[in-house]
Curated annotation (Swiss-Prot):
Lineage: Bacteria, Bacillati, Bacillota, Bacilli, Lactobacillales
CDD domains referenced in this protein's UniProt entry, alphabetically: AsnA
Keywords: Amino-acid biosynthesis, Asparagine biosynthesis, ATP-binding, Cytoplasm, Ligase, Nucleotide-binding
Record-level Gene Ontology MF annotations: aspartate-ammonia ligase activity; ATP binding; catalytic activity, acting on a protein; transferase activity
Provenance organism: Pediococcus pentosaceus (strain ATCC 25745 / CCUG 21536 / LMG 10740 / 183-1w)
Gene it is expressed from: asnA
Protein name per its UniProtKB record: Aspartate--ammonia ligase
Length: 335
């Protein structure tokens, strides 16, 4: 449990004002985001049957919260880590047209998360997915989509400034594109997270591309499941966050795997046993559209725009009492 206490922290808004600001940010952002990317809101599951292969395996070591239900005692059911694969199936199931897509309010539990200022076991994000043509599976499509998302986030900065000028955290005016290999080449002696901090402190906002594959050093920058993002066409939107003196990830996204790239990545990840799961069979049999998608952290975005020191100020979760006590002593009011 690593907790950062900013010096002389002033939350600016009361707890009740913060709650109202959270509502405003969430409602305004999802409307603007949906319009800009041509996305429709869909209801989404909080849990899925384990056997479908629809849950997000994250880095491959986290275990989902699972249970059985009275009317289906033989079926193992998992609370989702994310909806990365479910969304792609939903686009097919509900006949979304080319260049249209969906977003949903995703709530997840990641019980193996290491708790700190920005990590919680409760995850709330706008999960989104959009149909693209096979010919659009390239860096140009990825970068254009990132620029659109950045534009919406910048627009939200203005909206928050208009309503809460005393509280808004000011963002950089542009986003820069850097690959994980470029980062390793430049900062070979730093850890991956230290590299992210260094480049974000220098540039303000970065889209860090190509996460999941092995770098020249033989190490990975970070883990990614092998069966949704194409590791050559994905990345994270990171902001330098002055209150915590570190990079803050707001979104993880990417162009999704093709049949070929999924097989390649499953082999690299030694996860070829997944090929026989229903989701993977649908993809291999050309039954799913080519897509781009990702997740945007709702609490993280609120935290960023309001200059909060702890994600627990903008979401209700469970925290160690020692963390709660230390936060309260320093004007950090955990919900």
């Amino acid at each position: 449990m690593d907790l950062i206490i900013p010096a002389s922290y002033d939350p600016k808004l009361s707890v009740r004002q913060t709650q109202e600001a959270i509502r405003y940010i969430r409602e305004t952002f999802q409307d603007e985001f949906g319009k800009e990317l041509n996305l429709s809101r869909l209801s989404a599951p909080m849990f899925v049957p384990s056997a479908t292969g629809l849950n997000d395996n994250l880095n491959g070591v986290e275990t989902p919260v699972s249970f059985s239900m009275q009317d289906m005692p033989e079926t193992s059911i998992e609370i989702v880590h994310s909806l990365a694969k479910w969304k792609r199936v939903a686009l097919k199931r509900f006949d979304f047209e080319m260049h249209s897509g969906l977003y949903t309010n995703m709530n997840a539990i990641r019980k193996d998360e290491d708790l700190d200022n920005i990590h919680s076991i409760y995850v709330d994000q706008w999960d989104w997915e959009k149909v693209i043509d096979q010919s659009e599976r390239n860096l140009t499509t990825l970068k254009e989509t990132v620029q659109t998302i950045f534009k919406v986030i910048k627009h939200m900065e203005h909206e928050v400034w208009y309503k809460y000028p005393e509280a808004v955290y000011h963002l950089p005016d542009q986003i820069h594109f850097v690959t994980t290999q470029e980062l390793e080449d430049r900062f070979p002696k730093l850890t991956p997270k230290e590299r992210e901090d260094a480049i974000c402190k220098e540039l303000g906002c970065v889209f860090l591309m190509q996460i999941g594959g092995t770098l020249k050093s033989g190490e990975r920058h970070d883990g990614r499941a092998p069966d949704y993002d194409d590791w050559q066409l994905n990345g994270d939107i990171l902001f330098w966050y002055e209150p915590l003196q570190k990079a803050l990830e707001i979104s993880s996204m990417g162009i999704r795997v093709s049949e070929e790239s999924m097989l390649k990545q499953l082999k690299i990840a030694n996860a070829e046993d997944r090929i026989h799961l229903p989701y993977h069979q649908m993809l291999l049999n050309h039954q799913l559209p080519y897509t781009i998608g990702g997740g945007i952290g709702q609490s993280r975005l609120c935290m960023l725009l309001l200059g909060k020191a702890h994600v627990g100020e903008v979401q209700a979760s469970v925290w160690p009492q020692s963390m709660i006590d230390q936060c309260e002593e320093n004007q950090i009011h955990i919900l």
